[in-house]
Amino acid sequence: MAKCLYCYKELNGNERDFHKACSKKIFGTLEAPILPYTHNNLNDLARQVIRSQTTLTGVQAKLSLDINKGSKNEPGRFTIVGLWGRYILKPQTERFGNLPELEDLTMHLAEIAKIRVVPHSLIRFEDGELCYITRRIDRTNEGRKLAMEDMCQLSEKLTEQKYKGSYEQIAKLVLRYSSAPKLD
């Protein structure tokens, strides 16, 4: 039986990948937008993004996406937009198999534990390969950037040093800046 990529519950006979309500929650539309790419054309797309100097920082490969609205009878389509997209897509990697599925499952487990998480889901490339997608919470619906700080900024580190730290350093930052450090 087919399962919803957002909530993992069974789909009705005519639904594909998402319940209408689940699609509305993550994408804002009753029908999920089409992701018109395949893993094979990702390298070309990545080169274009790098040439435009609009890459997203981090360890894992990712692309910034936005939705081009479809007509009344057509679903929307995701397009790669550099830094200003409202979604982040993380595809499969050759080095670590099933990383998108693991990240989505981890987020679901966090939700079950009553930890607030960003809106997230799995989604399929045109060829059926699963990717992880998350809606950015640092952007308005119009795409304007919202100010947010991360541990790199709080620790006054350069972006290049973002992943050179320890849990102890993070704990000290939480103690320093939090009004409820034992809860944070």
Q: PLM features: what roles do these ranges have?
A:
Residues 23-27, 31, 35, 43, ...:
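Generic detector of well-ordered alpha-helical segments enriched in charged/polar residues
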Residues 42-164:
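Conserved ATP-binding subdomain of kinase catalytic cores across diverse folds
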Residues 6-8, 37, 87, 132, ...:
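Sequence-level detector for tyrosine residue identity
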Residues 2, 21, 32, 46, ...:
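A sequence-composition feature that detects small, non-aromatic residues
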Residues 1-43:
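Regulatory N- and C-terminal appendages and interdomain linkers associated
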Residues 157-184:
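Helix-hairpin-helix/helix-loop-helix acidic hairpins
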